[in-house]
Amino acid sequence: MNESFDKDFSNHTPMMQQYLKLKAQHPEILLFYRMGDFYELFYDDAKRASQLLDISLTKRGASAGEPIPMAGIPHHAVENYLAKLVNQGESVAICEQIGDPATSKGPVERKVVRIVTPGTISDEALLQERQDNLLAAIWQDGKGYGYATLDISSGRFRLSEPADRETMAAELQRTNPAELLYAEDFAEMALIEGRRGLRRRPLWEFEIDTARQQLNLQFGTRDLVGFGVENASRGLCAAGCLLQYVKDTQRTSLPHIRSITMERQQDSIIMDAATRRNLEITQNLAGGVENTLAAVLDCTVTPMGSRMLKRWLHMPVRNTDILRERQQTIGALQDTVSELQPVLRQVGDLERILARLALRTARPRDLARMRHAFQQLPELHAQLETVDSAPVQALRKKMGDFAELRDLLERAIIDAPPVLVRDGGVIAPGYHEELDEWRALADGATDYLDRLEIRERERTGLDTLKVGYNAVHGYYIQISRGQSHLAPINYVRRQTLKNAERYIIPELKEYEDKVLTSKGKALALEKQLYDELFDLLLPHLADLQQSANALAELDVLVNLSERAWTLNYTCPTFTDKPGIRITEGRHPVVEQVLNEPFIANPLNLSPQRRMLIITGPNMGGKSTYMRQTALIALLAYIGSYVPAQNVEIGPIDRIFTRVGAADDLASGRSTFMVEMTETANILHNATENSLVLMDEIGRGTSTYDGLSLAWACAENLANKIKALTLFATHYFELTQLPEKMEGVANVHLDALEHGDTIAFMHSVQDGAASKSYGLAVAALAGVPKEVIKRARQKLRELESISPNAAATQVDGTQMSLLAAPEETSPAVEALENLDPDSLTPRQALEWIYRLKSLV
């Protein structure tokens, strides 16, 4: 049966009618329908869940004359199954029994109590600890895009207005949302196709007036002027849809979402999707996290610190006041790193605990962890108090103290609480007098049963008599089969066993009712007290969120201080003058994976030297040199120290990389097409303050086409755009550019060749490379010797055809070694076809006149 069923459910059983009505409200997502100790799925949901979760697909009787496909999961294991579904981009509606089976006529009342979606999860078990989990919404009109993101586990709400497709693609790459909402008429489907968690939403959810109303209602404001987003209509359309979706799925208030922030292009260094991918900031080219910049830099001790560091890496800021403040803090903290990190480690993930508190889904152990975080604050204050740094003291102030809340949680929650409130035993003894009384009654059962057993043995004289309890039959008096005929007349048989009989007496039954009542009352009161704790904590939510943010920032800065000391990084200097000057720069990732010392190299880019033409052998280190420059700039612009002896860096607005390429088969684009698309983006958007890395432009086409394109691109970047450019190439013709235009210089990475072996020096020198060592590299790669030998022969042939291959031509180009030979003269061609032995003297004379006319 398909879920697009007829709304007339009268042919079905009452229970299936209830299920189908609930399912009709959530047709697009899986419905977990609670039945006793299981969540059941029916019809198409069951078939889908069976495939996604690898669980058995069975059948449950029949309804409306058809067998019902069914699959189920145990309620106690639901979080594990939800995690699997969320990771596959699925959403699930959780339907619970809210009625009492004992008093219900017909099916027990059920209700969808929450909807779990990839972008709105807050449960600890479902989240990646050290990664942001974002819900996003995208909107498009004739002027550009609107984009909003929300991290429900922190309340961080952002919007932006990307002007064009490339910028929008870069934002999607940077934020990598777990779930993306888009309008039903969204035109640029190619931009989002293939992304996980796509959700098509009706147009009215993006309506601007509705969005303003929703946002003002959420923030308790009359307008959005105070947030600086009043005129960001496209961004607000996306934000309104996003907020509506969160309210629909969470079905509770969202007090931790207290503001919205506009992200503006001019505030940060812009990196397109290709640049983020090529620089391997948080993900390597294979999709993993090994050997990335984050893998080297992230030794934070809290999950919230790790997430903040990754946000910094993907959004380097251009405000040098902020950057200098971070640098100062990193320097000031160096003497206290070893004392601070063990204490910070104990703080844990306070940010996400607060989100669960706001959503009222925090579990007892969340409150215990919050208490433990509060207990670290006095020690952190004591250590930071001695640090002579204004930014550090500002952070310390934001951390707060929360002594009253710490005291409350120490009094209210036991040291090691159970997982769930319904398990009981969460509220500490002494916190509430009535609860202690009910517990004493329940806990006193053991003493009472011991006294009853002794009394009844003495009264009856039966030495096999025991008093016990089990969950099915409650309290009982047990007598062995051999003595059961001696049981007193007031003993009422309750259960017969193989070797014993079990009885009940009125006194024991009365006590059982009293104990069970006390346990139920204790649990109900405990749940009430637990809910009251939320009411006592939530008024402090804004201050608590500020504290969590300050603690995360402290963790990041302490981590950067430790990394600077451990990895021998230096503090870069910011200048208003354009350019980058690096002394003994190193690649932060490569130097960590090498088994040999890394060769540090200098770099000098300035208004007088804006472009470096980089030549040298394959594997010589050109790409490493280029990438390390971009990574050093990136680290400088998050406020970090950098891997170099000395760095002076001017304003940078964008970083572009055109490094390597692969076929984009899904979009039907060849390697060369991908390369040219990325190149076009650079030429259209780079400015004189952009850092541009161009590696091997023009490889995917013919020699002359490739050389022409590379020449023209270099010329455009150097003469027109005047960007800070590193231009690596194997076209030696380009080494003539410095002679033809200002601001261009040659550098090369050298190698030494000895016989069939080659040694790469990895050292950057001024001037052009003398040769490319292509055959030596091929031999090193294991190309068969006979192929290398034949290649050398062919190379000699080509060089003999064009002996002046390295000479500069008048038109500014240079003959490639593989270029076609010069066009043969008609006289030479005639002589080649001539057989002198067959000529008569008269014919020979005629040939002389003919050749004369051809010259």
Swiss-Prot record:
SUPFAM superfamilies reported for this sequence: DNA repair protein MutS, domain I, DNA repair protein MutS, domain II, DNA repair protein MutS, domain III, P-loop containing nucleoside triphosphate hydrolases
Q: Report the SMART domains cross-referenced here.
A: MUTSac, MUTSd
Q: Which residues bind ATP?
A: 616-623
Q: Name one GO cellular component term.
A: cytosol
An example GO biological process term is:
mismatch repair
In its keyword annotation, does this UniProt entry include Iron-sulfur? Answer: no
Task: Look up keyword Phosphoprotein and say if it applies.
Answer: no
Q: Cite the GO molecular-function annotations of the record.
A: ATP binding; ATP-dependent DNA damage sensor activity; damaged DNA binding; mismatched DNA binding
Q: Which Gene3D superfamilies match?
A: 1.10.1420.10, 6.10.140.430, DNA repair protein MutS, domain I, MutS, connector domain, P-loop containing nucleotide triphosphate hydrolases
UniProt keywords (A-Z) are: ATP-binding, DNA damage, DNA repair, DNA-binding, Nucleotide-binding
Give the record's family classification: Belongs to the DNA mismatch repair MutS family.
PANTHER family in the record, alphabetically?
A: DNA MISMATCH REPAIR PROTEIN MSH1, MITOCHONDRIAL, DNA MISMATCH REPAIR PROTEIN MUTS FAMILY MEMBER
What is the role of the protein in this entry?
This protein is involved in the repair of mismatches in DNA. It is possible that it carries out the mismatch recognition step. This protein has a weak ATPase activity.
List the protein's name.
DNA mismatch repair protein MutS
The gene for this chain is mutS
